[in-house]
Amino acid sequence: MGGDFAPQATVAGALLALGELDPRHTLQLVGRSGVVGEQLDALLIEPQYESLGAHRSRAEIVEAPDVIEMTDKPAAAIRGKPNSSMLVGLKLQAEGKSDGFVSAGNTGAQMAASMVVLRLHTGVKRPAIATLFPTGRKPIVVLDSGANVDCSPDELVQFARLGVVYAEDLLGRENPAVGLLSIGEEPEKGNAVSKEAHQLLQAAGLNFLGNVEGRDLPAGACDRGPIDVVVCDGFVGNVVLKFYEAVAPLITRMLVKAGVDEKTMMGALKQLDYSEHGGAPLLGVNGVSIISHGKSSPRAIKNAIKVAVQAVETRMNEHIGRHLA
């Protein structure tokens, strides 16, 4: 039950999700049961949530007394807090008692716990965080966006394969086009890792467009056509992600200062809001583990849960296993 605004935002997001999901779906709220139960009761008497009371029977509370803080070191947290909501929640999935896991808690701990509990698919060297980036065309998948600060050329190729499955299953793209993020479109541009990765991607049997530049991300396309998947290491990916997150608020402030109506601007820039997409799957683990922003609102949690449901319903995890076998 992690996140900067937990448990309120997490429980509220779960209620919103239950209100929109098919009635056959249920949720497990994992955390300190007394705290979660009190939060659930408090929300259901609020005007904006009271109509969701009929869905409470679809929300099961699972006790997990330990709390992994945002400041905890991942390895120490996993060893020292075995009854945290993160570990308990992931173990439910590993034991077949749930189908997916969503958290807005400590990202490093979630990554480490997912690898320990769910384990990696056979052949996967490292998992990658796959984040949806809004563009002037359609959203694109960028990975890795923070799991691995250093990557080998082989790992970047593997990330491309993971991203292709994501684009096919969750975005409905046919023969997704892959770009390698670099400092120029020419194959010889970039560092040693990106130049070797370029050669490997050309021979990987994917719809590889070649190198793409930072300016191509907002457009969702390069000179060679539309982009569906962008591959980079987690250091670069996370820098780009954090920059993207700051764009909408910055533009809004600038235009409001210039006299443009704030409500109008927020509506126009809605697609740049991370809460629209909710969460990013940790691809490569043998299960569904969705990483949400630490500052996730109830709406963001709701959308992250919907991403998890979509991943389960499209059997994305099985497809990844077959694709990398």
Predicted feature residues:
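Glycine-rich phosphate/nucleotide-binding loop
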Residues: 10, 115-142, 219-230, 234-325
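Solvent-exposed alpha-helices and their adjacent loops that cap or buttress functional pockets
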Residues: 19-21, 52-55, 78-82, 92-96, ...
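N-terminal glycine-rich anion-binding loop in soluble enzyme alpha/beta folds
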Residues: 4-70
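Short, glycine-rich nucleotide/cofactor-binding loops
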Residues: 1-8, 78, 147-157, 291-298
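Glycine-rich phosphate/diphosphate-binding loop of Rossmann-like nucleotide-binding domains
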Residues: 8-9, 21-28, 33, 149-214, ...
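Phosphate/nucleotide-donor binding subsite
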Residues: 49-98
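Short, conserved active-site loop motifs that form the nucleotide-linked donor/cofactor pocket
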Residues: 58-59, 140, 206
